[in-house]
């Protein structure tokens, strides 16, 4: 007990520092707007990503980390194993996992397939116009400089509107080298190397990447090579029979007096310097 008491002042300081950081960020949002603050945060994260090695980018590893989830899409063409990134894309990950456990995706078709681009599913209507999130409303894109539309990426499909993520998702299938398209956009070296194996860089920051295929890309390619009609819908009915949650993730709920409410997502990270 004495040892615990010894660290109480330090814990209090860290909590106050964290709340101070959150308070200042909220003030900045109120004065300058969300876009300004979000861009500033993203720029700071990008600077860190540009200096990082391969291990900083979870898509580049086939291993499922302790802070990651794992699912298997059992399709009519075979299994696709995907790991999810709840700490980097909390909303998209929670949405997908809850839908999977509720069997929302069971029996849905791959309604849109574009060869050498991507395969898309998650729409109960089967035509690209349906589906909703677990919150019954759309949610915003979660951009991060640590996740990209490289080959095998799992991402949320949206309409282009500000908060239009629902239930639809796509898997990037393109195999062609995309590294030359990156130019001087500031991509981290490990990601440039990954794009040499294919991907869709035009989708970066526009769509939320929240997972990566770690097994079953041959199945993705099989679906990607299907014959389609003029609306990019496969002429052969290919379905997601079920989505098995192999490794779940517990999303923590944090209550603070500052906000007077609930903040749901990933556990708070006290910044090194507030």
Model regions: which residues?
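Cyclophilin-like peptidyl-prolyl cis-trans isomerases
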Residues: 1-274
